[in-house]
């Protein structure tokens, strides 16, 4: 099931890039990111209430709160950078650079989460890096 969810995420992320590039034309990139954020917040809380998951908020640990807040700040910074880059650059160049986050995530997961960095991971990172370079040059 995780594979199909990840694939769905990739499809929706691709749609996000195209829809954002069209929608951001003539709009301040920070304002566009804020509008997107409001939509995401409403949708996320709608799903929380629809699935009756709101009761779980009481059992979230202080550590989880800290890391969820930090993750939210990182998401906000990412979206602000992404929207500005998308506004001034070509989607076909901005999106591949943005997807270097895969490589950065693998490296950070190795350093901070002590996840395995296998030969396959290294080769994959190199291929993603080389592919990104090929797409943006």
Positions of PLM-derived features:
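Hydrophobic/aromatic residues within transmembrane alpha-helices
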Residues: 23, 32, 85, 111-113
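Hydrophobic residues within alpha-helical transmembrane segments
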Residues: 4, 8-11, 35-39, 66, ...
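Helix-helix packing/entry segments at the starts of transmembrane helices
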Residues: 31-38, 80, 87-106
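Hydrophobic transmembrane alpha-helices of multi-pass small-molecule transport proteins
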Residues: 44, 120-136
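C-terminal transmembrane-helix exit sites in multi-pass transporters
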Residues: 102-122
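Hydrophobic/small/kink-forming positions within alpha-helical transmembrane segments
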Residues: 10, 14, 18, 45, ...
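Membrane-interface interhelical linkers
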Residues: 1-11, 27, 40-67, 79-88, ...
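Juxtamembrane helix-loop-helix junctions in multi-pass membrane proteins
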Residues: 15-39, 57
């Amino acid at each position: 099931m995780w594979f199909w969810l990840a694939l769905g995420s990739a499809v929706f992320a691709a749609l996000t890039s195209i829809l954002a590039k069209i929608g951001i034309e003539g709009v301040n990139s920070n304002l566009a990111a804020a509008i997107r954020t409001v939509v995401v917040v409403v949708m996320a809380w709608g799903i929380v209430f629809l699935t009756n998951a709101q009761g779980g908020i009481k059992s979230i640990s202080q550590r989880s709160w800290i890391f969820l807040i930090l993750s939210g700040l990182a998401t906000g910074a990412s979206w602000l950078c992404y929207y500005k880059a998308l506004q001034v650059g070509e989607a076909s160049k901005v999106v591949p650079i943005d997807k270097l986050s895969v490589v950065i995530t693998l490296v950070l997961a190795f350093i901070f989460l002590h996840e395995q960095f296998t030969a396959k991971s290294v080769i994959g990172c190199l291929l993603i890096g080389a592919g990104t370079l090929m797409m943006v040059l």
